[in-house]
Amino acid sequence: LIAEGLLAPYVDETVPPEMLEMSLARIRQLSAHEVGHTLGFEHNFAASTQNRSSVMDYPFPLVKITATGELDLSEAYDVGIGEWDKRTVLYAYQDFPDGVDRAAARQKIMDDTIGQGFKYVADTDARSISTSHPDGNLWDNGADAIQELEHLMKVREIALQRFSERNIRIGRPLPTLEEVLVPIYLLHRFQIEAVGKLIGGQYFTYRLRGDAQEGARPVPVARQQQAINALLATIDPAVLRLPQGLVDLITPRVPNNPKSRETFSGATGINFDPVAPARSAVALTLRVLLDPTRAARLERAGAPGFDAVINGMLAATWYADASTGIDAVIARQASLQVLYGLLGLAFDASADNNVRARSLSAVQELDAWLARRSPRDQAMRAHYAFARHEIDRLQDNPAALETLVPATLPPGSPIGSYSE
């Protein structure tokens, strides 16, 4: 689906060789990954930050943009095993000659590996969005998570602008364009998590007493603020808006081919809802920014602090300049998602009390701001009035937060258990 969405390949009934080669490259990579498990090797989710140094990572396809603005998948997956893999094989399976002190020899292999700067992050410090190691991520790319997110957003923009009937095979129902659209519209979903781990993040190694590995160090404050800004850029209505031509292409579903968990969950019945994708994308970003564990780490660190996240979200939504057209509808939806997210955190009994207090304070400050506003636009007046109603209702009865229907996210990770 990703290849179909990126390349819009179906000029006629033939399947372009680029798609076949990408599929074969992925199969080869996955085969090497499973052989690695057979040999006893665990995942290394930091490999993507070191030029794809291991097949034991979960690789996201590398998409390049050519000088002419074309999308290039020729190096979507790496060839062969990586340098980290060679080091692990050397350590585990080296056949030492007689008379060699094997323990000392293996220790030298380990010391050399550390000295060469290889990184390793295990499953436990990578899978959850709450984890703090910036290098521990699934389905990400690049040494610079922020730079890679910005690159993926450009790739996404190109693919969405070119999205057409050519994204599905001739003879397929046009509504099934939505299944191809989902992974392209949410192309950045895993890179969002990678950027999020810079916020309140901490670099660390699995040190042993007496080894040469570095101690823990926090992500610099300026870098954390860059990460916050990069994530907020993903909820800009102009970024979330779909081209109107694309929206018009996705007609109501044909009989016996209903919407599924692989499509967006909208509010417009059988008609494609152009706001539903935006709601899903905003939810992906907010669940990273409003993660209770991350928020607590920010509070403990002092700078940039959880206030940097709250103030940034409010500036990007409620306090942003008014939009028009469909952008305004998307902006109002995103604003309410921020409000509900803050209220949810404020009344989350498992969250840190300082985080809860700051979240509730932000909601009350927003309520006071809304009370002073009197926009001319009728839709905005209604939006503000509804927001104030929701603030009063949910503060009086926090249990009602459980009745809110969250954005339904289409499945993302193709594999994901600890053993795969």
Where are these regions (language model features)?
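Conserved catalytic/binding loops enriched for acidic/polar residues
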Residues: 17-18, 22, 50-420
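Active-site-proximal segment of zinc-dependent metalloprotease catalytic domains
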Residues: 1-38
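Catalytic Zn2+-binding segment of zinc metalloproteases
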Residues: 35-49
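Active-site proximal loops enriched in glycine and acidic residues that flank catalytic Cys/His/Asp
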Residues: 27, 43, 47, 60
